[in-house]
């Protein structure tokens, strides 16, 4: 459902990024190979995603991003009825890492009460000059359209919010 803004970029100030960095550093995250919902994988490349990830479930950390997501929801004109937040997915991409084209909102209902993911966010935690690749492509049109997507390589502390069904 594409209505309102296609995406919204928020720039966190360096103090906030430092706090997020410190918080994550002190969490003792158990990084594991990233997995893609196997039900969604039928006939697809098993190397769709090559990265490490951990799930952050700490309530105050999640609430901080939930509150920002609510404000972005309003400012972007999406007007979703947001009732909660998933644990935050923290990912690390090494040399050769990737996550090919996908839709964040799968076909399966993931939450009690029938809720689905509505808003996604990617927060860039490194400056673009610290790595090669790492472009974020957001599709906003049909695959046969030109252009059909926009490419982002944002500075450290920038977050892109977008509707999960694109």
List the predicted regions and their residue ranges:
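Fe(II)/2-oxoglutarate oxygenase catalytic core
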Residues: 1-159, 165
């Amino acid at each position: 459902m594409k209505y309102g803004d296609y995406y919204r970029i928020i720039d966190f100030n360096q103090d906030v990024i430092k706090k997020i960095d410190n918080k994550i550093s002190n969490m003792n995250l158990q990084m594991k190979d990233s997995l893609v919902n196997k039900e969604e994988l039928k006939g697809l490349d098993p190397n769709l995603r090559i990265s490490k990830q951990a799930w952050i479930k700490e309530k105050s950390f999640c609430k901080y991003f939930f509150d920002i997501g609510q404000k972005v929801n309003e400012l972007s004109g999406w007007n979703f009825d947001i009732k909660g937040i998933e644990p935050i997915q923290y990912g690390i991409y090494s040399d050769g890492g990737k996550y090919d084209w996908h839709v964040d909102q799968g076909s399966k209902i993931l939450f009690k009460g029938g809720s689905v993911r509505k808003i996604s966010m990617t927060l860039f935690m490194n400056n673009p000059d610290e790595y090669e690749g790492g472009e974020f492509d957001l599709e906003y049109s049909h695959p046969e359209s030109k252009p059909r997507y926009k490419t982002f390589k944002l500075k450290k502390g920038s977050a892109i919010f977008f509707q999960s069904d694109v």
